[in-house]
Amino acid sequence: MKSSVRIASLDDAETITILINSAFRIAEGFFIEEDRINLEGVQNYFTTGRFLVTAIDDIPAACVYIEPRGERAYLGLLSVEPARQHNGLGKLLMDAAEEFCRELGCRFMDLNVVNLREELFGFYGRRGYVETGTSPFPADVVTKLPCHFIDMSKLLTT
């Protein structure tokens, strides 16, 4: 089983949409009723940032969105195909995203975690991310439970 990380192209948008929705359906189905994102939404992300894709034997199995913003970068939509979760793909992709942004001159990586996804605080905390505040959950997303984001950040050391 050979894995590789690459920068996604707009041609990958449909595959990325399916990957994100399958991962988030499992993880967030208890509080979100709809798909996490549609094809147009993924395509719009390509105008402001990039997706990295991890492929196993040339088949996309995980993706993450990164958006460099000067000395800071934003990371979001970390998604691993449900059947491949808990096998280190998320860590591999996080390492690649952090290195990519570091090479662009970013000093910090920022991300948001839904407060209801408590298991993610440990995952990101072990990777050096610390809580920096809160922000509102998008008002246009229908949720079954009230929720908000916990903002987290990490210094990208050299």
Describe the function of each predicted region.
Residues S4-I16:
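A short beta-loop-alpha structural element at the N-terminal edge
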Residues T17-T47:
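Conserved GNAT-fold acetyl-CoA-binding loop/helix
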Residues Q43, F51, R107-D110, V114-F121, ...:
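C-terminal "cap" of GNAT-fold acetyltransferases
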Residues Q43-V53, A62, Y74:
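A short helix-loop-beta-strand connector motif used in the catalytic cores of GNAT acetyltransferases and
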Residues I59-E67, Y74-S79:
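Conserved beta-strand in the GNAT
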Residues L75-G76, H86-A97:
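Glycine-rich acyl-CoA binding loop
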Residues L78-Q85, V113-V114:
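A short, internal acetyl-CoA/4′-phosphopantetheine-binding micro-motif in the GNAT/acyltransferase core
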Residues L92-F108:
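Conserved acyl-CoA
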